[in-house]
């Protein structure tokens, strides 16, 4: 069905570019030591390549776990990118991706993936760093103290933007001025400039 499609959409072209510039072998090599193998009982794990592609697609389109699961059913382009044929198999569910993201976070692999992609882009001359644009984005958090300890998260602080006060953190994002590609992301308390 997908191969008979005549018009290539913007999403198709975007995912083709992501396919071309992403060092998939390096990403798999970085994650493989921590990824579960199919040696035990129960359902065998979904292939690492497929989970990485699903994770990258989720990040590119800013989707939630449920959102990427739905997108796999809705979008031929994303299905083709991830490598799923719905006539033969079902898409991985949101919980599977959640567990994969937790695995990446637990072993600090998200930073390794980010650095591998940026290193690969720099090698290909796609990340020039002739100038950097830095912006800070507020990430709101609930100011509630209704948790187990009865305390606020010590990493969160108040910050004022205009006349409005916010509670949470800031993401300081560095972007290459020429290409627009993100090369640095640092999270700090909300009161850090």
Where are these regions (language model features)?
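Short, Lys/Arg-enriched N-terminal segment that forms or immediately precedes the first helix
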Residues: 32-43
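Charged, often Cys/His-bearing segments associated with DNA-binding zinc-finger transcription factors
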Residues: 1-25, 29
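Alpha-helical support elements that line or immediately flank enzyme active sites
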Residues: 50-62
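Secondary-structure capping and boundary motifs in well-ordered enzyme cores
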Residues: 23, 43-48, 60, 88-92
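Polybasic low-complexity intrinsically disordered regions
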Residues: 49, 66, 70-73, 82-83, ...
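Short N-terminal amphipathic alpha-helices
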Residues: 27-30, 44-46, 63-72
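Short, solvent-exposed alpha-helical "recognition" segments
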Residues: 78-80
């Amino acid at each position: 069905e997908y191969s008979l499609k005549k018009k290539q959409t913007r999403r198709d072209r975007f995912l083709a570019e992501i396919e071309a510039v992403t060092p998939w072998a390096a990403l798999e090599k970085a994650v493989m030591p921590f990824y579960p193998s199919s040696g035990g009982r129960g359902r065998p794990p979904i292939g690492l390549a497929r989970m990485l592609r699903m994770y990258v697609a989720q990040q590119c389109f800013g989707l939630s776990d449920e959102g990427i699961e739905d997108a796999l059913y809705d979008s031929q382009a994303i299905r083709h990118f991830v490598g799923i044929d719905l006539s033969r198999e079902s898409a991985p569910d949101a919980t599977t991706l959640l567990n994969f993201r937790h695995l990446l976070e637990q072993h600090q692999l998200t930073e390794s993936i980010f650095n591998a992609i940026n290193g690969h882009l720099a090698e290909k001359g796609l990340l020039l760093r002739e100038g950097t644009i830095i912006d800070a984005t507020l990430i709101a958090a609930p100011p509630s103290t209704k948790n187990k300890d009865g305390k606020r998260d010590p990493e969160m602080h108040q910050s004022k933007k205009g006349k409005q006060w916010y509670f949470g953190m800031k993401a300081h994002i560095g972007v290459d001025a020429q290409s627009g590609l993100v090369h640095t992301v640092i999270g700090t308390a909300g009161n850090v400039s």
